[in-house]
Every structure is written in C-alpha cells, then in structure tokens.
Amino acid sequence: MNRHHDLLTAGSGGDTMDGIDQAGENRCSRWFDQMPERAARFFKQSERPLVIVSYAQSLDGSIATYDRKPIPLSSHHSMVLTHRLRAVSDAILIGINTLIIDDPLLTVRLVEGNNPCPIILDSRLRIPAQSRVLRRRGHRCMVAGTIGPSHERVAELEELGGEVIHCRPDPCGKVDLVHLLHQLGRRGIQSVMVEGGGEVITSFLQSRLADHLVLTIAPRFVGGLPALGRLAAAPLSFTDGFYHCCGPDIVFFATPRWHE
C-alpha cells in the first residue's frame, strides 16, 4: 500500500475491501462532513488539491446519446447528493465541450452551502462570451488553457470577469493536468470536484489524479456515448468502497487504488 493511498484513507477505518458495503444516511453524511478536513490534510502533504471525480451514468455505462445530447440520468434524490458534494468542494471542473452543450451554472441550489469556484478545461479558450458561468455572481470563472498570456482572447475573457490559467500543454496539446492542479494549489484551492464530461473524467483517471470517486448509476439503458474511454492495460480497483441507495439510483463511493 503506497503513501498516496495511506494519506487518502487515513482515519477511514478500513483497509482494502473485498466487497462493497451498503451505507445508510449517517455514513453518507459523515463522508460529506469529513471532506473539508480530508482535503486540508491531503493538500498540506501533497501541495495540490484533492480531486473527487463525480458523474452519473446509465446501467449500460452511457452518459449521453450518441449524438451527444445530454439526458437526465440522476433522480432528484441523487442530485441532492451531487449538490452536497459541490457545497463541500472548493472548486468544480468541467471540460469545454460540456460547457458548450449544457451551459451550466455549476452552483449549489438543492442544499445550503457555498458555491464552488468554476473551472473550465479549455485549451484553445473557446468558451463563449455569453456562457452563464462567466456571468454568474461570486467566484470568478477560471479558464485553464494552453494559449499564451499575450493572446487577445485572454484579454477578452478577463474583461468579462474570467481568470485565465496558463498551463503547459501535454503531449496531445491539451492542458497538462498535473501542472493545472499545482497552479490551483498555489491559489489555495484544496479540493476540486470533476463533473465531466467523459473525456475529462477519463483524462483524470488515466493520469492517476482521481483521489475519490462518486458514481451515480441510474436504472436505465441508453445505448449511447460511454462514460469512459480507454484507461490502462490493468483494471482499476478501489478501496473503502460503499454504496447508498438514493431514490431509484445507486451512488457508489470509493478511493481508486493505483497499482505501481
């Protein structure tokens, strides 16, 4: 068991679990209540934010139709849990494709709590000027791109109230996620909730940067776009896993176990 795993599971009261426990409301509440302390402990030792990957999929693993039209998967009950996670996260991150398709606000609405800082992964700074997340009150929207600070698009976004984070490109020309997380750490962000879409979720898992997973499974078949792309040759396993029945949905909580 490596240091990274020890750090994430410290105080959780369990080692690797062969099975998955069913949890009641009390255990779920403790998980959310302990998130800020867990994130602060992780941040102090790693100097980067704790990353919680959270998304909803159908029983057949779809997150959208094949023509990329969003479909409502989460019930109201599981959406409340999603908003609880937003409320205990310092920031919430999505990719530019999700923003263009959904134009979300990324705020906390179904529970009491503070809104997380919105972060958009947008290598080429394609975010539309009319995006709601740029115009909402509160935190400035952070846009992570690979375009240099002298580009005219940077000035346009900053004039709209956004903050452009200049990141190194990875080998594919996209935002280097490790570099981004360390830049967020320097800004004092201790936890980041990654909500999508599938390409972004896959990138965090491929890079072994997902520290916790919260997966909502809806009792539907869609036959659409898969939630995940190719991850690695070895299957990904988890520790400290438990699930909670939330209305018609099942919400799965776990810590990825990265094999050396």
Task: Describe every region a protein language model picked out.
Residues 2-260:
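Enzymes that bind and transform nitrogen-containing heteroaromatic metabolites
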